[in-house]
UniProtKB/Swiss-Prot annotation:
Entry GO terms, CC: endoplasmic reticulum membrane; mitochondrial outer membrane
Pathway listed: Protein modification; protein ubiquitination
Domain notes: The RING-type zinc finger domain is responsible for E3 ubiquitin ligase activity.
UniProt organism field: Gallus gallus (Chicken)
Coiled-coil stretches: none
Name of protein: E3 ubiquitin-protein ligase RNF185
Lineage of source species: Eukaryota, Metazoa, Chordata, Craniata, Vertebrata
Keyword annotations of the record: Autophagy, Endoplasmic reticulum, Immunity, Innate immunity, Membrane, Metal-binding, Mitochondrion, Mitochondrion outer membrane, Transferase, Transmembrane, Transmembrane helix, Ubl conjugation pathway, Zinc, Zinc-finger
Length: 194
């Protein structure tokens, strides 16, 4: 940044003192492209639209900075240097050829429309549903039931809540629960008489 100042003043001095016009025009064109690149938003890295500058000296598009501030209402810091920043701590920039002199901070981007995604349909049988407790049974080898800690400490977060009584899913779960209980009783009775 410090090197740009002397080259600009040197090219201005050479053109004002009657230096060669070819070198000053090539420097002027080079400065123009560099000048266009210096007015980039530090968030979207595009040419700043409705440019504002923070008190710490960083340039932003107002729509980009507004979105940045809205998504972090509790911690409003500059995206570049993490200095404190707010709507009141930015200064609008009005360049040559700008048509509107309206403060860009007064124009907030429109709020996006809300969208409600449809719930995920898991389908199929979700598990046992003894009452509303969502009883879980686990099997193991010998005296080591593998699922006792998950059942005792309720670590099984992946299971959905039981079905609401009166729904077709609840009726299906009750039917399957009774069917498995009947099968278990038949097997136990068969083991007793064998």
């Amino acid at each position: 940044m410090a090197s740009k100042g002397p080259t600009t003043s040197a090219s201005t001095k050479s053109s004002s003192t009657g230096g060669t016009s070819g070198s000053s025009s090539s420097n002027g064109a080079g400065d123009n492209t560099n000048q266009d690149n210096t007015f980039e938003c530090n968030i979207c890295l595009d040419t700043a639209k409705d440019a504002v500058i923070s008190l710490c000296g960083h340039l932003f598009c107002w729509p980009c900075l507004h979105q940045w501030l809205e998504t972090r209402p509790n911690r409003q810091v500059c995206p570049v240097c993490k200095a404190g920043i707010s709507r009141d701590k930015v200064i609008p920039l009005y360049g040559r050829g700008s048509t509107g002199q309206q403060d860009p901070r007064e124009k907030t981007p429109p709020r996006p429309q809300g969208q409600r995604p449809e719930p995920e349909n898991r389908g199929g049988f979700q598990g046992f549903g003894f009452g509303d407790g969502g009883f879980q049974m686990s099997f193991g080898i010998g005296a080591f039931p593998f699922g006792i800690f998950a059942t005792a400490f309720n670590i099984n977060d992946g299971r959905p809540p039981p079905a609401v009584p009166g729904t077709p899913q609840y009726v299906d779960e009750q039917f399957l629960s009774r069917l498995f209980l009947f099968v278990a009783l038949v097997i136990m009775f068969w083991l007793l008489i064998a």
